[in-house]
Amino acid sequence: IPNYTVFSLWDTFRATHPVDNLIFRKKTAEFLNTFQNQLRNGGQLPIWDLAGNYTGCMIGYHSVSVITDAYFKGIPFSNYPELYEGMLSIANRSKLGIPAYKRFGYIPSHSESESVSKTLEYAYNDWCISKMALAFSDTLNYLDFNKRAQFYKNVFNDKTGFMQPKYNGNWSPSFS
């Protein structure tokens, strides 16, 4: 079974993988197998790997959107439940601003770089997880991740019309 690397998921989850899920269905199943191997051997789904190594760069956990899209487009793969467990795990790690995101409903700008971008990416990824939870009849996780999917609203400033950072619960004074 082929093993792939350098998915560059932050760059490809929006367009490349959804198209792959339509026209390269067998290859997508191979990608899912690689995700499963990375989960089993590395302890988490990929975020951004390079030459088979986890780099820790890029934001979000976009393998979940690739998996969700593949599932709902009917890509044959026998181990979606294992990938779903990996999705829950990666979305609940204790790093990259996730604890603050879960606590406050956004990532405070003084605690983590790229706070607004991470909040937006996590909210989308959580929406994907909520859809998988619903498909797997996992009501508690559906409710939790559906709520988290709404966190993008917490960084939208009605007065400026922009997504912007918050500092100590208030809009960051340095936003321009």
Predicted regions: what they are:
Residues I1-N3:
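Conserved oxyanion/phosphate-binding beta-strand-loop segments in alpha/beta enzyme cores
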Residues T5-T12, T16-A133, N146:
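Aromatic-rich carbohydrate-recognition surfaces in CAZymes
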Residues P46, A135-S176:
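Catalytic cores of carbohydrate-active enzymes
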